[in-house]
UniProtKB/Swiss-Prot annotation:
It comes from Arabidopsis thaliana. Gene3D superfamilies: Tetratricopeptide repeat domain. It is found in: Plastid, Chloroplast. This is Pentatricopeptide repeat-containing protein At4g14190, chloroplastic. Residues 1-88 form a transit peptide. Belongs to the PPR family. P subfamily.
Amino acid sequence: MENLTTAQFLHRATLLKKPPPPPWNLNSSFLTSTSYSIPRPSSLRRSLPLSINGDATQPTSLLHHHRFLSSLTRRLSLSGSCPLRLLQEDGDWSKDHFWAVIRFLRQSSRLHEILPVFDTWKNLEPSRISENNYERIIRFLCEEKSMSEAIRAFRSMIDDHELSPSLEIYNSIIHSYADDGKFEEAMFYLNHMKENGLLPITETYDGLIEAYGKWKMYDEIVLCLKRMESDGCVRDHVTYNLLIREFSRGGLLKRMEQMYQSLMSRKMTLEPSTLLSMLEAYAEFGLIEKMEETCNKIIRFGISLDEGLVRKLANVYIENLMFSRLDDLGRGISASRTRRTELAWCLRLLCHARLVSRKGLDYVVKEMEEARVPWNTTFANIALLAYSKMGDFTSIELLLSELRIKHVKLDLVTVGIVFDLSEARFDGTGVFMTWKKIGFLDKPVEMKTDPLVHAAFGKGQFLRSCEEVKNQSLGTRDGESKSWTYQYLMELVVKNQKTVP
C-alpha cells in the first residue's frame, strides 16, 4: 500500500467542499448490439486492451483518493498547466493517479508530454522501470500514431535499462507503422523482433494483412500469407474472416470465395461482418443470385442490415427491373431484428407502385394503417406516381386532400407530379390555387423524397426543367439574390418552355 505524501495531504486540506466527479469513467464497458457494421482494420486485433487501473494500489482513504484525483484533473485542465510541475509539487503519484494523468494527456492530445512525465515518475521508484509500464506507454503512443515518441521509449527501455521488449510491444509498433502505410518500417521491426529471439504470432500477421487491405495492396497480402506459413503461424478463424473481408472490399471475388470455402470446410466461426462484406461485394458487381443467397443467410441469422447496404441492394433490383424483389427485401428487413423502418415501407410501396398494382398498393397502405405508420413525403409521392401511372385522377385529388388534412409536408417532387399531370389531361388548377391560398407555393423549395423513388421512376419533365433553369441561373445576379420558392421556380419553367422553339 502506498502512503500519501505530505504535499498530497496539504493539497487536500485546502479543499473546502467535495469536488465533482472526474470527467472520465474509469470503468470500461462493452456495448452489445445485434446491429453489425463492417469493421475497420483497427477493430480486428484480438489482443485485450491493457487496463489503466490494472495495477492501481489501494488508497488510504477512498474519499481522499477521489478528492485528490478530481483535484489533479482540475489542475491539469488549467490553462498553461504543466504535469511535470504538478508532479514536483505533489512529490509523487500513486500508480492509479499516474495512469489517470497519462490518460488525461492522451485525451487532451498532449502526447508530447506523456514520455517526459513517465520518465520523471518512473525514476522516483526503481520498481516502476518495468516491461509492463513501458508496454502500456508504447501501446498508448502507437494507438495515437505518435511513433517518434513510441520509438524513443522503445530505445530507452533497451539502451538505458536493458529491458527486453515484449511481443505485444513489437506488435503495437509493427501494426501502427503498417496502418500508416509505412511498411518498410514495419518490416524493420518485424525482423528486429526475430533477431531478438521473438517469433511473430498469427496476430502479428493479421495486423499486417489488415494494413495491406487498407492500402489496397492485395498482392502483398498473398506474400504476407506465405511469410506467415514459413514462420509457422497457423491461420485461425480471425485470419480467414479478415481475408474474406479484405478481398471482398477489393472486389477480388474469386479469392474471397476461396477463403470462404476454406473457413467453412474447417468449420470455423463465420463472423456477421464477414457475411455483410460478401453481400456488399456481390451487390457491387450485380451478381443477383449470389447476392440473394447471402442476403437470405443474413436475414435468417437475424443480422441487421445497414441502411446504406439495403439501398445498394434495392438499386441493383431497380437497375435490373426486378421490382417485385423490392417487396421481398422490405419484408425481409422488417422480419429481421431490424425494426420496421420507413425504408422498409418505402421499398414495399415502390414495388407495387412500379408494377402498377392497385391491389398490392392498397394492401401495403392497409398494413401501414394497421401498424399506425405516419405518412411522409416519400410515401405520398410514391402513391401519387402510382395513381398517375394508372391515370386515376380521382385518387390523386383525394390523396392530396388527405395529405393536407394530415399535415404531410410536400416537396418539389409533389409539385412536379401535379405540374406534369396538368400538361396531360389532369386539371391541376384547383390544387395549385389551394396551395397558393395556404402559402405552400411561397415556401422555399425542398426535396424530401427518398432518392430510391427517382431511381425507380426517373425524374419527370418538370424536375428536369427545374434543373435546367437552375443551372442557367447559377452565377447570375438574379439567381443569387432571388429566393427559390415553388412559385418562382414554376414561373421560370413556364418562361423557359415558351422560349424553347
